[in-house]
A protein has these predicted regions:
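Trp/Phe/Arg-rich N-terminal binding region typifying the photolyase-homology
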Residues: 32-46, 52, 56-106
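Function-dense linear segments that define catalytic or interfacial modules
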Residues: 21-28, 57, 281-285
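Conserved catalytic core of Hanks-type protein kinase domains
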Residues: 24, 67, 500
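Short secondary-structure boundary/capping segments within folded domains
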Residues: 6, 39-42, 269-270, 378
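Anion-binding and metal-coordination hotspots
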Residues: 63, 81-82, 86, 91-552
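Basic, low-complexity segments
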Residues: 1-37
Length: 552
């Protein structure tokens, strides 16, 4: 399209796609998505270009096809199509996403951008990890709405014969046909209590009716959801037998029946959200996104780290990062961060970070950077096993009211003892899962430092985490000025990349779809679009059979 030549910047995403769309999105790349019978109405390369531009600009399907029809830059990006090239309906995008989701390579658009970056030498051995909230696309439900919606969902998926049997068990005067809250005087505590109790009895009656029946997948899934929402939010009074809303929050609580996988989450202790977490790994030198993952909002930042680093670390990375090292609760003043569980011990030849890691042989090893959320003991153990250079921050232990923190105690893992600031030594009592506890007990009663150490009449107890040694080495490494300099120069780069991903609210910060699998696919496509935009700034071009970036 000659009109765009000279008007569209070659370093823009439109310029990159115009030059490279045929190399990136060849017909062969999508051949497995289509049969040989019939005729495709829209070439898959054009659909892929529209999907990428849709994500980078935060558009709905209808807005995207409209933009393709009337924005010359979009047709220029799709290989220089004439302005009168016919458009297509938005369902073509829906169909392409469905085909990709059913395929063996649902994230192939992201994969091809990463492969091009690797071929151009833009992906080194460093990785920076971070996460960001992704707000869900559904409304958070209260307990009454959750239970009623789950009952309604079960009745909807049951066949006519089973539905008749289920409805015969219902006690409330409610046909469960409409969505939303049931009619009730919510200002009347007695009426509210009767409503909750009635919903509970209806729910348990339906579950009892299904007991020992052979259920189809849809009914089984709906029954499981109903059992979950009733069990998580209600308690039965032992005295009068009435079901009431529990005065607690269940672990891993379901917050919507429309999207049962979304969760309450906290990016920080003061900032909560409802939805998912998007996790990324980037190369800090080129700022290319190398991996993405999506988890429920209540998952820890370090939980998917092994998956983010799977292509970069030797071995299978099978260690469960979610099995983090956390001190036992008690008077020891544990930090809420999972990394705060470890403490003193002798550093060995596995020292992490520091100036020794800048040696020439160290540059051939992977390096992983992350904030304190990635200072979990299990992740540190995985990185040590992979001989990676570790630049993930570990929080120091804390204690309430300025008392002695755990780092004031001498933990000797080799001798399995702990010595307190008053030079009293006690053995570590091992725990089944690793680690253990050191109980000072009676020694604290006459200790002159007791008031500065504990307020418990039972004395001080020190919890020894399963990954005590790894956390000890990590804390020792981050005291090195060279480690601090490298960390401060490298880790913040991921924040800018998060900003690029979240630039648009629709499809960026706010999910466009429901369910973790679909949100993950959408997040991966967004990362591919951001990578393509980065290609323009790096001057990435196809050079014969290879890819090359412009000289720095």
């Amino acid at each position: 399209m000659s009109f765009c030549e000279g008007r569209v910047a070659p370093e823009s995403i439109y310029g990159v796609l115009h030059r490279e769309c045929f190399s990136l999105f060849s017909d062969e790349m999508f051949a497995d998505l289509f049969t040989d019978v019939g005729r495709r109405s829209v070439p898959p390369m054009i659909v892929a270009v529209v999907m990428v531009l849709q994500r980078i600009e935060g558009l709905s399907d209808r807005e995207a096809v409209e933009r393709f029809a009337f924005d010359a830059r979009w047709k220029y990006a799709a290989g220089g199509l004439d302005f009168d090239y016919p458009g297509f309906v938005h369902t073509v995008l829906v169909d392409m996403r469905a085909r990709l989701a059913r395929s063996d390579r649902p994230d192939r658009i992201f994969e091809v951008t990463l492969a091009a970056a690797r071929a151009a030498g833009l992906v080194g051995r460093k990785r920076v990890l971070d996460s960001t909230p992704l707000y869900d696309a559904v409304a958070t439900m209260d307990t009454v709405t959750l239970i009623r919606s789950a009952i309604r969902g079960l009745l909807q998926v049951a066949d006519s014969a089973l539905e008749a049997k289920l409805r015969a068990r219902l006690r409330r005067d409610d046909d469960y046909a409409s969505a939303g809250k049931p009619v009730c005087d919510y200002d009347d505590p007695v009426a509210r209590e009767a409503l909750v109790d009635g919903l509970a009895w209806d729910a348990y009656a339906l579950l009892a009716c299904l007991d020992e029946r052979e259920l189809g997948p849809a009914v089984d899934k709906a029954a499981e959801l109903l059992a979950t929402v009733v069990g998580q939010d209600l308690d039965r009074d032992a005295g009068d037998g009435v079901f009431r809303i529990a005065r607690r929050v269940a672990k891993d609580r379901v917050i919507s029946t429309v999207d049962p996988q979304t969760r309450h989450g906290h990016k920080t202790s003061a900032r909560g959200f409802d939805g998912y977490k998007g996790h990324i790994a980037i190369d800090p030198d080129s700022e290319i996104i190398t991996a993405t993952e999506v988890t429920a909002g209540n998952a820890g930042d370090a939980d998917p780290a092994a998956d983010l680093l799977a292509a970069d670390l030797p071995g299978d990375g099978a260690q469960d990062i979610g099995d983090r090292d956390v001190d036992e609760p008690g008077d020891s003043g544990n930090h809420p961060n999972p990394a705060a569980g470890g403490d003193t011990g002798d550093s060995d030849d596995k020292a992490l970070g520091g100036a020794d890691q800048d040696a020439s042989d160290g540059q051939d090893r992977p390096a992983v950077y992350g904030d304190a959320a990635y200072g979990a003991g299990a992740l540190l153990a995985t990185l040590e096993a992979a001989h990676a250079r570790i630049f993930t921050k570990v929080q120091p232990p804390t204690a309430p009211d300025g008392r002695f923190a755990k780092d004031r105690f001498d933990v000797d893992l080799a001798a399995s003892t702990v010595t307190c600031p008053n030079a009293v030594t006690v053995p570590i009592r091992p725990a089944k899962g690793g680690g253990g506890t050191a109980v000072f007990g009676p020694a604290c009663a006459k200790c002159p430092l007791a008031t500065r150490c504990t307020s418990s009449t039972a004395g001080r107890t020190i919890a020894i985490g399963r990954y005590e040694a790894e956390l000890t080495r990590a804390r020792a490494a981050q005291d090195d000025p060279a480690w601090v300099t490298e960390y401060r120069a490298t880790r913040p780069k991921v924040e800018r990349k998060i900003g690029h991903l979240m630039r648009r609210r629709h499809g960026g910060r706010r999910a466009r779809v429901r369910g973790r699998t679909k949100v993950a696919a959408d997040f991966s496509l967004l990362a591919a679009a951001v990578n393509l935009a980065r290609f323009g700034m790096l001057g990435l071009r196809r050079a014969g059979a290879n890819w090359a970036a412009a000289p720095a």
